[in-house]
From Swiss-Prot:
Primary residence: membrane
Subcellular location: Cell inner membrane
Matching PROSITE patterns: ATPASE_ALPHA_BETA
Entry membrane topology: Peripheral membrane protein
Residues with site note (Required for activity): S373
Subunit structure: F-type ATPases have 2 components, CF(1) - the catalytic core - and CF(0) - the membrane proton channel. CF(1) has five subunits: alpha(3), beta(3), gamma(1), delta(1), epsilon(1). CF(0) has three main subunits: a(1), b(2) and c(9-12). The alpha and beta chains form an alternating ring which encloses part of the gamma chain. CF(1) is attached to CF(0) by a central stalk formed by the gamma and epsilon chains, while a peripheral stalk is formed by the delta and b chains.
Protein name: ATP synthase subunit alpha 1
Positions contributing to ATP binding: G169, D170, R171, Q172, T173, G174, K175, T176
Known EC number: 7.1.2.2
Protein source organism: Nitrosomonas eutropha (strain DSM 101675 / C91 / Nm57)
Function of the molecule: Produces ATP from ADP in the presence of a proton gradient across the membrane. The alpha chain is a regulatory subunit.
Family membership noted in the UniProt record: Belongs to the ATPase alpha/beta chains family.
UniProt keyword terms in alphabetical order: ATP synthesis, ATP-binding, Cell inner membrane, Cell membrane, CF(1), Hydrogen ion transport, Ion transport, Membrane, Nucleotide-binding, Translocase, Transport
GO molecular function (one): ATP binding
Length: 513
């Protein structure tokens, strides 16, 4: 077979035309030092702040310090296989995590990778962990309640959808218990929950996941884990990853709740990273931008208007508002709320639930200090019936605390003071609630109504909780229609009041408690 020159030239021409050459331009550098998960890389001339860097063996890192002749980065994951002189590549991408409904019911790490042994996650997409919070015009005022199912919280420090409410207290005062109860109470409320565990023992996290599975709460919950055994870098990015997962639902016109447990550990991790990166230390050895660390995270929790949702979904969702409610947890040392991180987060959030060791040890659980705890915006969102009935509870408890201190020194008390003390004692007793025993609005309203109307006045304080439990059972069994009406309307009209009074009087006359 012979080929003439014209055929050869045509063949070569067709081959050249069909040739696909893909070139990839990526800056490369080399590791010059590696210490405690912090690397210094030389030669990355056009790296971005917060860019993902690719190390040998499929390991990734995060560029944090951009200096004149080197880049300081943290490694995300194992780094035992890395050595000085290894090649590092820029990726041109910032750190992203998977988002979407597929994550519900899953336990993932700070990078969104599943760690529950249930196989890969078929995510709806990838989103950057660092995002700019919605602007002023995009926001809507908080006016819808987020019920926690806890009498003391919903009556005294109500939380609204889109609010940031801090839970603060010493270790072992029940901070996580309040947050987990809030998650459990969202069952059937069309609320997506994200629980971010930072720097906790793996056994504690396993117990939380087990409990959420038992009560059927994992169906609407995502658990993001950066346990105490993981690197400081993973503990630092975990809250941002969880927030991005929550924002996906907020921007679709849904309601989401995120718990950061706890941000003190994140601040410690960030301090560790900053000191290893040789950033100048400030107060309590924290870096200068520790306030920004938490403010840029918590400002992303908001209630957004329908225009924002429509724009975010490309016009697919119209006329719906979305919200992301945040419950950050801060651990104090010996009740000191004037320390650096607690004061920062108190100033960023819309109120705080302050838990006290003394109250906890006295058996008052949740151990909420009514005088110091406050909700700055939740009042506008509070359920009408609870607002009407619970208005005097907080004042009664605060006055009781004050009077109780004086009563220790006074030998004889006048009738009015004695009554106030008795009412305060009873209110304190009735605010007690077992863990995982969340209440419906109607059940809460029943207790508050009976307390306000004086039906507990002749009950022995030691029998108060048993009386309350028996009363609820009686009304639920014989007058379920009253509770159903309160649950549906979330209001208490004159007719319902009369019916409730009659039901309570009937119960007291029978005396079955």
């Amino acid at each position: 077979m012979q080929l003439n020159p014209s055929e050869i030239s045509e063949l070569i021409k067709s081959k050249i035309e069909g040739l696909s050459v893909t070139s990839e331009f990526r800056t490369q550098g080399t590791i010059v030092s590696l210490t405690d998960g912090i690397v210094r890389v030389h030669g990355l001339s056009d790296v971005m702040q917060g860019e993902m860097l690719e190390f040998p063996g499929g390991t990734y890192g995060l560029a944090l310090n951009l200096e004149r002749d080197s880049v300081g980065a943290v490694i995300l994951g194992a780094y035992e296989h890395l050595t000085e002189g290894d090649i590092v590549k820029c990726t041109g991408r910032v750190l992203e995590v998977p988002v979407g409904e597929a994550l519900l019911g899953r336990v993932v790490n700070a990078l969104g990778q599943p760690i529950d042994g249930k196989g890969p996650v078929a995510a709806q997409g990838m989103e950057p962990i660092e995002k700019i919070a919605p602007g002023v015009i995009s926001r809507k005022s908080v006016d819808q309640p987020m019920q926690t199912g806890l009498k003391s919280v919903d009556s005294m420090v109500p939380i609204g959808r889109g609010q940031r409410e801090l839970i603060i207290g010493d270790r072992q005062t029940g901070k996580t218990a309040v947050a987990i109860d809030a998650i459990i109470n969202q069952k059937g409320e069309d609320m997506i929950c994200i629980y971010v565990a930072i720097g906790q023992k793996a056994s504690s996290i396993a117990n939380v996941v087990r409990k959420l599975e038992e009560v059927g709460a994992m169906a609407y919950t995502i658990v993001v884990v950066a346990s105490a055994s993981e690197s400081a870098a993973m503990q630092y990015i975990a809250p941002y990853s969880g927030c991005t997962m929550g924002e996906y639902f907020r921007d679709k016109g849904q309601d989401a709740l995120i718990v950061y447990d706890d941000l003190t550990k994140q601040a410690w991790a960030y301090r560790q990273i900053s000191l290893l990166l040789r950033r100048p230390p400030g107060r309590e050895a924290y870096p200068g931008d520790v306030f920004y660390l938490h403010s840029r995270l918590l400002e992303r929790a908001a209630r957004v208007n329908a225009d924002y949702v429509e724009k975010a979904t490309g016009g697919k969702v119209k006329g719906k508002t979305g919200s992301l409610t945040a419950l950050p947890i801060i651990e104090t040392q010996a009740g000191d709320v004037t320390a650096f991180v607690p004061t920062n987060v108190i100033s960023i959030t819309d109120g705080q639930i302050f838990l006290e060791s003394d109250l906890f040890n006295a058996g008052i659980r949740p151990a909420i200090n009514a005088g110091v705890s406050v909700s700055r915006v939740g009042g506008a969102a509070q359920t009408k019936v609870i607002k009407k009935l619970g208005g005097g509870i907080r004042l009664a408890l605060a006055q009781y605390r004050e009077l109780a201190a004086f009563a220790q020194f006074a030998s004889d008390l006048d009738e009015a003071t004695r009554k106030q003390l008795e009412r305060g004692k009873m209110a304190t007793e009735l605010m007690k609630q077992a863990q995982y025993a969340t209440l419906k609005v109607s059940e809460m309203a029943l207790t508050l109504f009976a307390l306000n109307k004086g039906y507990f006045d002749d009950v022995d304080i030691k029998r108060a909780l048993a009386f309350e439990s028996a009363l609820k059972s009686h009304v639920r069994s014989h007058h379920a229609a009253i509770l159903d009406k309160i649950e549906t309307t979330k209001e208490l009209d004159a007719e319902t009041e009369k019916a409730l009074e009659a039901a309570i009087q009937e119960f007291k006359q029978n005396g079955i408690y």
